């Protein structure tokens, strides 16, 4: 029936009992990778989207400010920004002013883009959409962190458990509130996988650990005098602090999985190559990329900055 749940009936009960006996009784976290669920979080702040998408082992889809116009009212009225009475009237006034500036600028920037990039032979519909997207992309930097968005998530039970622990231990009230809502919904579809979250002896201890770790970090930040804001510098605001890996690391990483020799032997052979040969090898490892989705191999993970 339409109202039945995945774990209803005898088969569902047996499956739930199996998961719970292994997951709770033996503590084998990996079994929680065997089931997943979709969650849609609507009207969440830009700050919360960062909390939601911090976990590595999940799939996320966020409504992009690059394609959505924020000059329209949301259901119930008002611009699309997070509201809380504890933030006071000055907050709402400031948000309305920012979104008002955005709305006025959107019309002007769209007109500028239409003049800057004339239509030519392109059909009118696609051209108008591209002009709109250009204007939205140029103005998205005006949108504040309180801007609301939607985020879709697909994740395993294990990934959701970690997400809920982070949200429940967060100092952000919105994160704790939405975390409770996510837990309630997951309890309807994958209850065994999130059964530890609200148990004091399991999830409770984990959440307390995360809270204590954050408090300890904040204490050390204060002790080291790092809790004060820096003055805005006149020069560049981005510095290259360090680079991990070099050309040899990258090339060795690319070749390793296709060879039957040690990495030491690979590096020895690379050292004997000329600059021209290395450049040719690098080009071959990159390949003929037709678009941004054609990604080089994992050997490129050997270098980061």
Specify the residue positions occupied by each region the protein language model found.
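A conserved ligand/cofactor-binding region detector
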Residues: 1-305
């Amino acid at each position: 029936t339409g109202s039945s749940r995945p774990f209803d009936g005898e088969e569902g009960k047996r499956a739930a009992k199996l998961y719970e006996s292994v997951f709770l009784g033996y503590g084998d976290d990996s079994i929680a990778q065997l089931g997943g669920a979709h969650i849609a979080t609507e009207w969440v702040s830009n700050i919360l989207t960062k909390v939601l998408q911090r976990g590595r082992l999940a799939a996320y889809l966020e409504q992009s400010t690059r394609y959505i116009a924020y000059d329209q009212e949301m259901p119930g009225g008002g611009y699309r920004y997070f509201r809380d009475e504890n933030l006071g009237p000055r907050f709402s006034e400031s948000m309305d002013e920012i979104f008002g500036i955005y709305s006025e600028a959107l019309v002007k920037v769209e007109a500028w883009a239409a003049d800057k990039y004339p239509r030519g032979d392109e059909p009118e519909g696609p051209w108008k959409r591209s002009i709109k997207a250009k204007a939205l992309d140029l103005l998205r930097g005006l949108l504040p962190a309180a801007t609301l968005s939607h985020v879709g998530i697909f994740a395993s039970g294990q990934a959701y458990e970690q997400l809920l622990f982070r949200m429940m231990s967060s100092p952000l009230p919105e994160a704790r509130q939405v975390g409770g809502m996510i837990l309630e919904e997951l309890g309807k579809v994958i209850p065994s996988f999130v059964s530890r979250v609200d148990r004091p002896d399991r999830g409770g201890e984990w959440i307390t650990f995360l809270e204590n770790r954050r408090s300890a970090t904040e204490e050390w930040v204060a002790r080291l005098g790092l809790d004060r804001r820096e003055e805005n510098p006149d020069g560049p605001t981005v510095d290259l602090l360090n680079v991990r890996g070099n050309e040899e690391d990258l090339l060795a990483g690319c070749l390793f999985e296709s060879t039957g020799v040690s990495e030491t032997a690979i590096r020895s052979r690379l050292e004997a190559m000329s600059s021209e040969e290395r450049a040719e090898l690098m080009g071959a490892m990159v390949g003929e990329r037709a678009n941004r989705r054609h990604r080089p191999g994992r050997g490129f993970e050997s270098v980061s900055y």
